[in-house]
């Protein structure tokens, strides 16, 4: 009997995107196989590691060992504070230098052309370059120059890239939304100002947008900052718990598709 192709759309959200690891962990534990992934920003980073064949346990170790200061390659702030070379090197290493089209799971990576406002979806070529473009938070990272374009964070045009996995051929689409805005009183760093501003803007866009996913997973992340990696285990657990609650619904979607 034919099986539906399951697509997973991983949304942006800065550090909160680590909750995607919990989503992937739950799906794996319940033997729900993901056939294709699309990601914006942190969703692209997590998706690229998983598509390269890393299991969630390995990805958790990488996340817990992450120290933002080690990857903060500051530069004179003309177009952004961070060059992003160290993050690119990290992605290159953990995706084994492979192009997107050679990863174990088909992957779509979303970025935005800063000059035209066009959504750019990478389905082939360098994984590390595409992810570097997708995480280029305006004002923080220098935009990525690639193929004659100046590219910034995919979340600017598509925070939860459901349409991308649909175009990739998914029959059932699961989306992970980590866009809940943290209610904060104090911004202690310019990064906090930029991230909170982006969060508020994009949270409003998501709130007023119809997202055509069959299953929408929304981990409870309101108390966590998008710019802080201090609560990694808690954010991963939130993603896993939210997905566990949706497993029966996912199974029903699969059963209904098979019976149609």
Curated annotation (Swiss-Prot):
Disulfide bonds: none annotated. A motif (GXSXG) lies at residues 39-43. It holds the Pfam family Patatin. Keywords: Hydrolase, Lipid degradation, Lipid metabolism. A motif (DGA/G) lies at residues 153-155. PROSITE patterns: PNPLA, UPF0028. The active site is at 41 (nucleophile), 153 (proton acceptor). One of its GO terms (biological process) is lipid catabolic process. One of its GO terms (molecular function) is lysophospholipase activity. Transmembrane segments: none annotated. The keyword Lipid metabolism applies. Residues 8-166 form the PNPLA domain. Belongs to the NTE family. PANTHER family: NEUROPATHY TARGET ESTERASE/SWISS CHEESE D.MELANOGASTER, NTE FAMILY PROTEIN RSSA. This is Uncharacterized NTE family protein YlbK. It comes from Bacillus subtilis (strain 168).
């Amino acid at each position: 009997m034919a099986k539906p192709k399951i697509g997973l759309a991983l949304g942006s959200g800065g550090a909160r995107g680590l909750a995607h690891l919990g989503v992937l962990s739950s799906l794996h534990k319940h033997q729900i196989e993901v056939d294709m992934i699309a990601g914006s920003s942190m969703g692209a980073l997590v998706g690229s590691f998983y598509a390269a064949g890393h299991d969630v346990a390995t990805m958790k170790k990488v996340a817990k060992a992450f120290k933002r200061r080690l990857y903060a390659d500051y530069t004179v702030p003309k177009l952004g504070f961070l060059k992003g070379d160290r993050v690119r090197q990290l992605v290159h290493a953990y995706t084994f230098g492979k192009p997107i089209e050679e990863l174990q799971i088909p992957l779509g990576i979303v970025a935005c052309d800063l000059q035209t406002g066009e959504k750019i979806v990478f389905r082939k070529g360098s994984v590390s370059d595409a992810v570097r473009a997708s995480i280029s938070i305006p004002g923080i990272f220098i935009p990525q120059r690639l193929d004659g374009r100046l590219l910034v964070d995919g979340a600017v045009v598509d925070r939860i890239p459901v349409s991308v996995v649909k175009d990739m051929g998914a029959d059932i689409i699961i989306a992970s939304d980590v866009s809940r805005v943290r209610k904060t009183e104090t911004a202690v760093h310019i990064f906090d100002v930029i991230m909170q501003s982006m969060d508020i803007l994009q949270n409003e866009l998501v709130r007023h947008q119809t997202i055509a996913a069959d299953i929408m997973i929304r981990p409870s992340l309101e108390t966590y900052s998008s710019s802080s990696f201090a609560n990694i285990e808690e954010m991963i657990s939130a993603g896993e718990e939210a997905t566990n609650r949706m497993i029966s619904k996912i199974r029903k979607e699969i059963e209904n598709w098979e019976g149609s």
